[in-house]
């Protein structure tokens, strides 16, 4: 039985994107494919091994809702990798990855001496990932601290209990989180808590979506249907909350941050990629926007 109930759909798709990008030479995540295999979704495992998502000539070339999202996830992963390296060069030694899922940055990236990476997610997600990585004899590249808690609960207190110091600058990562996964009030509370725990000089990298519109909802349905045609029953709609969301860069600008907005074209360009053939259709409607920000 597949373990998506344990690790979540977004974590699974993120691992799939990293596995594809690793085979293409765009990333170096040797753990993405084994983790995906451990989740146990046969279609994804076979598709990656067969290079199904690797080119416009592939069987999903007529479905940009699939390929465009995988490209976007891979591009943002690479962008965040570089964001964290830059934060390390600037002297930041405290990193928090919110809803870390199957991310393996504490194992696969270069880190300056003395860096601690805090990974926050539900305990069962962290336990699943740790078990698979132990079986792979994966070696940590820096100090890692797993914080098993739901982000709707008091995660700042949980961070403090394991040594997080809000007086020191932090590099924050929020991937596939500010995209409707939380209800509007929950997202606002998370951003308030993050801001309160951020000393001057802290940095944030996130993807985000403004309030979902009818075109995006239709694109989401097309995305889910694309997976179902290939035997993968993912109810992405169950992870999406409707409501009026603050535009994240504007929210940050009014709460003590200096934000810089970025587009998917910026991120794909950093990988030497352009849009997939057909990506201008409705399938790209729910590709997120991107922001980095510095606490002042």
Curated annotation (Swiss-Prot):
<comment type="function">
    <text>Exhibits S-adenosyl-L-methionine-dependent methyltransferase activity.</text>
</comment>
<dbReference type="Pfam" id="PF04072">
    <property type="entry name" value="LCM"/>
</dbReference>
<feature type="binding site">
    <location>
        <begin position="150"/>
        <end position="151"/>
    </location>
    <ligand>
        <name>S-adenosyl-L-methionine</name>
    </ligand>
</feature>
<dbReference type="GO" id="GO:0032259">
    <property type="term" value="P:methylation"/>
</dbReference>
<dbReference type="InterPro" id="IPR029063">
    <property type="entry name" value="SAM-dependent_MTases_sf"/>
</dbReference>
<dbReference type="InterPro" id="IPR011610">
    <property type="entry name" value="SAM_mthyl_Trfase_ML2640-like"/>
</dbReference>
<protein>
    <recommendedName>
        <fullName>Putative S-adenosyl-L-methionine-dependent methyltransferase MAP_3881</fullName>
        <ecNumber>2.1.1.-</ecNumber>
    </recommendedName>
</protein>
<keyword id="KW-0949">S-adenosyl-L-methionine</keyword>
<comment type="similarity">
    <text>Belongs to the UPF0677 family.</text>
</comment>
<keyword id="KW-0808">Transferase</keyword>
<dbReference type="InterPro" id="IPR007213">
    <property type="entry name" value="Ppm1/Ppm2/Tcmp"/>
</dbReference>
<dbReference type="GO" id="GO:0008168">
    <property type="term" value="F:methyltransferase activity"/>
</dbReference>
<keyword id="KW-0489">Methyltransferase</keyword>
<feature type="binding site">
    <location>
        <position position="121"/>
    </location>
    <ligand>
        <name>S-adenosyl-L-methionine</name>
    </ligand>
</feature>
